[in-house]
């Protein structure tokens, strides 16, 4: 008997809490919005993290966490990234090239063993620019 799910990989994507929602509800009702959540969940189940970098940026800002430190840590825990940028207040799915910190982070990392998804809600030209940028890394 094979272990359930051994023929494929199941991922859990990190969630997002905006500052507006955090202030409105005065708590964080979501699972897996922070590095701490990842560490706690990892103690209970073995799972593959789908790291949505833009979700982490918004959640880090909303919860007063260190985005760069947590991004470095979680980057090493995953082989799958969702990429877009935002203003750290809302998950707006902007071009990754609009965020110089994200661009520098991506340039500094070895992405060869990562699966990347562009999650950009802008016009096709922006998506193509992001795609070409990633393809050259």
Protein language model features and the residues they cover:
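Active-site acidic/histidine proton-transfer and metal-coordination neighborhood
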Residues: 1-48, 58
């Amino acid at each position: 008997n094979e272990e359930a799910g051994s023929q494929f990989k199941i991922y859990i994507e990190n969630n997002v809490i905006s500052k507006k929602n955090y202030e409105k509800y005065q708590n964080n009702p979501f699972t897996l919005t922070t590095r701490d959540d990842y560490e706690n969940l990892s103690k209970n189940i073995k799972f593959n993290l789908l790291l949505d970098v833009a979700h982490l940026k918004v959640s880090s800002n909303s919860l007063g966490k260190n985005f760069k430190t947590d991004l470095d840590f979680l980057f090493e825990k995953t082989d799958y990234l969702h990429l877009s940028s935002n203003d750290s207040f809302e998950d707006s799915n902007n071009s990754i090239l609009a965020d110089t910190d994200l661009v520098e982070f991506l340039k500094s990392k070895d992405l060869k063993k990562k699966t990347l998804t562009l999650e950009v809600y802008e016009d096709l030209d922006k998506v193509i620019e992001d795609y070409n940028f990633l393809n050259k890394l």
